[in-house]
């Protein structure tokens, strides 16, 4: 989905635009975003040659696959009139250009700053939208061919998605990771999820642990509800399944048979050690006068390593990329952290479904805290 982003010239253009706006209006935000988020509802902008162009309400829910969009959801506190909370989504079509996706990310930071740095930011990928995003459009999300910078390309928006196979494994922290779509990836010591694009199958290894089985079932239902929008079914393939049901699983997988499945798997604790070793924390700072990204090699990771004056990027490999925004960080640091997060998705060969989450200083979710030793709230 993401290509290497050539954001040097892009960032320059955007920051210059911010400077000009600041000089003429006193506001560090694009003119088309001024006044956004002051009433309940949603507002949408389509990125056109580095500019956020408002989308007519009659077109809400329709997204061109060749473009990028910013969607702002505003909710008013029922008990305190005039007090709002916000969610900012930047939606990326499967054929969007690198300039458009980069502009959407940068303008999202601008909008976040304009709203007091309190909004929650979400990255949405065409075909992998979150349930929260889809619920914004009662009539559903519709994909339209083409885009501002792309030619017309006909696509079947109802076509089944690509098949994917996931391994569910772990002792203390259960992880879900995509593996090769092959019977050779299976073993009886773990659980696996086969997403055919229309149906979801859970292979329960006879020697797998109960937490792995529970996690696999939960993840499979999330794939059905979020990725398939509630369509299709979840099938469990375990020791109680009939030979016909097992055969159906391998037919959907495309190869193999039960006799080819290995009985043993890598030790869960050793597996977790390897996964933890791949986790990397980067600091993005301009304290020296220059914008520098530094890899922090100290392990284990500690909460004290996160400084409010800077931004950080945590690449967990299996659980996605987290961009941590220090409450006192500069706009340049925020933009660079976003750029690095997006670059890691490509450079580290993450699947397109991998999530990149923006984490607010002081509002860290449990999934993020798990990577740090003795986190204190």
Swiss-Prot record:
Cross-referenced InterPro entries: ADF-H/Gelsolin-like_dom_sf (IPR029006), Gelsolin-like_dom (IPR007123), Villin/Gelsolin (IPR007122)
Keyword Signal: yes
Presence of keyword Signal: yes
One of the record's GO cellular component terms: extracellular region
Tissue-specific expression: Expressed by the venom gland (posterior main gland) (at protein level).
CDD domains for this protein: gelsolin_S1_like, gelsolin_S2_like, gelsolin_S3_like
Keywords from the UniProt entry: Repeat, Secreted, Signal
UniProt xrefs under PANTHER family: GELSOLIN (PTHR11977:SF123), VILLIN (PTHR11977)
The protein's name: Actin depolymerising venom protein gelsolin 1
Source organism (scientific name): Platymeris rhadamanthus (Red spot assassin bug)
């Amino acid at each position: 989905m993401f290509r290497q982003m050539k954001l040097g010239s892009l960032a320059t253009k955007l920051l210059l635009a911010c400077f000009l706006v600041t000089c003429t209006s006193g506001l560090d935000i694009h003119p088309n975003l001024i006044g956004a988020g002051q009433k309940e509802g949603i507002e949408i902008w389509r990125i056109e040659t580095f500019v956020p162009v408002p989308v007519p309400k009659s077109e809400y829910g329709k997204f061109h696959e060749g473009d990028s969009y910013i969607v702002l959801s505003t909710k008013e506190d029922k008990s305190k009139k005039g007090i709002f909370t916000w969610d900012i989504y930047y939606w990326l079509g499967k054929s969007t250009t690198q300039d458009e996706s980069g502009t959407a990310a940068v303008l999202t930071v601008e909008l976040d700053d304009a709203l007091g740095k309190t909004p929650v930011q979400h990255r949405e990928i065409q075909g992998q939208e979150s349930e929260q995003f889809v619920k914004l459009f009662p009539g559903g999300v519709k994909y339209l061919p083409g885009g501002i910078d792309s030619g017309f390309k006909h696509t079947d928006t109802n076509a089944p998605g690509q098949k994917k196979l996931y391994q569910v494994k772990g002792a203390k922290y259960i992880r879900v990771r995509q593996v090769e779509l092959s019977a050779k990836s299976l073993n009886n010591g773990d659980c696996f999820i086969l997403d055919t694009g229309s149906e979801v199958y859970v292979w329960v290894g006879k020697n797998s642990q109960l937490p792995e089985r529970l996690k696999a079932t939960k993840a499979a239902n999330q794939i059905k509800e979020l990725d398939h929008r509630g369509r299709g079914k979840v099938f469990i393939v375990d020791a109680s399944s009939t030979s016909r049901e097992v055969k159906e699983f391998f037919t959907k997988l495309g190869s193999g048979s039960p006799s080819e499945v290995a009985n043993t798997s890598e030790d869960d604790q050793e597996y977790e050690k390897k996964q933890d070793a791949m986790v990397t924390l980067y600091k993005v700072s301009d304290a020296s006068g220059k914008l520098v990204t530094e890899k922090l090699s100290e392990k284990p990771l500690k909460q004290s390593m996160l400084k409010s004056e800077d931004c950080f990027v945590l690449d967990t490999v299996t659980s996605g990329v987290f961009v941590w925004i220090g409450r006192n960080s500069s706009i340049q640091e925020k933009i660079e952290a976003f750029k690095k997060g997006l670059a890691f998705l490509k450079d580290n060969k993450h699947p397109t479904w991998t999530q990149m989450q923006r984490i607010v200083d002081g509002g860290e979710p449990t999934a993020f805290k798990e990577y740090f030793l003795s986190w204190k709230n």
